[in-house]
Amino acid sequence: MHRLFGRKPPTQPTASLTDAIDSLDKRSDSVEVKIAKLDAQLSVFQQKIANTRPGPGQTALKQRAMNVLRQKKIYESQLQQLQQQSFNMEQAAMTTESLKNTMATVQTMQETARQLKSQSKNVSIEKIEKLQDEIQDYMDAAGELNEVLGQNMTDINVDEEELDAELEALQQESSWLGDQSTAEKPSYLMPSNELPNFVDEEVAEPSTAQ
């Protein structure tokens, strides 16, 4: 069958906006180069016309300059169209990208809403309130337990007069022990506030043998 009717030509992939913009920019660059060359030719013709006397020669130069100028105008118009097309495609690309981002955001929001809806079915306000009450009960019980454990276990009723009498007895005993310790020390170890008495004696001079 393919031999009789032939094959369909392969389908070319559709160019993206980015590829189309790049192609337009390259064409614009090429046209700008051509316009620059025509400007250079016009400059040369202007010099030649200025240096040529009026007559057939100058008329021919002017005619050639007019042709170059006409080509320049055509290329300038073409360049303007290419730049406008490129600008329009850039705007379309930006709009397309913005729409993609918007759609992605909407899809994300829809998925989030779906998950929240699914999860909210498993959440009961009554269960949460009951759980909070239970937690509060546990905390209150723990606070009471800590309060009991923190009570002073050495709170014994003692008469203050007995404590004063015992303290006075301890002071008297300490004073008596101090006196006994002083009595047992030798006299030379006892502190004294008197100055020592020294015997001043004259030292005998040695006799000189005659």
From Swiss-Prot:
<dbReference type="GO" id="GO:0032511">
    <property type="term" value="P:late endosome to vacuole transport via multivesicular body sorting pathway"/>
</dbReference>
<feature type="coiled-coil region">
    <location>
        <begin position="21"/>
        <end position="175"/>
    </location>
</feature>
<dbReference type="GO" id="GO:0006900">
    <property type="term" value="P:vesicle budding from membrane"/>
</dbReference>
<feature type="compositionally biased region" description="Polar residues">
    <location>
        <begin position="174"/>
        <end position="184"/>
    </location>
</feature>
<protein>
    <recommendedName>
        <fullName>Uncharacterized protein C162.06c</fullName>
    </recommendedName>
</protein>
<dbReference type="Pfam" id="PF03357">
    <property type="entry name" value="Snf7"/>
</dbReference>
<feature type="region of interest" description="Disordered">
    <location>
        <begin position="168"/>
        <end position="210"/>
    </location>
</feature>
<dbReference type="InterPro" id="IPR005024">
    <property type="entry name" value="Snf7_fam"/>
</dbReference>
<comment type="similarity">
    <text>Belongs to the SNF7 family.</text>
</comment>
<keyword id="KW-0175">Coiled coil</keyword>
<feature type="region of interest" description="Disordered">
    <location>
        <begin position="1"/>
        <end position="21"/>
    </location>
</feature>
<dbReference type="GO" id="GO:0006886">
    <property type="term" value="P:intracellular protein transport"/>
</dbReference>
<dbReference type="GO" id="GO:0005771">
    <property type="term" value="C:multivesicular body"/>
</dbReference>
<dbReference type="GO" id="GO:0000329">
    <property type="term" value="C:fungal-type vacuole membrane"/>
</dbReference>
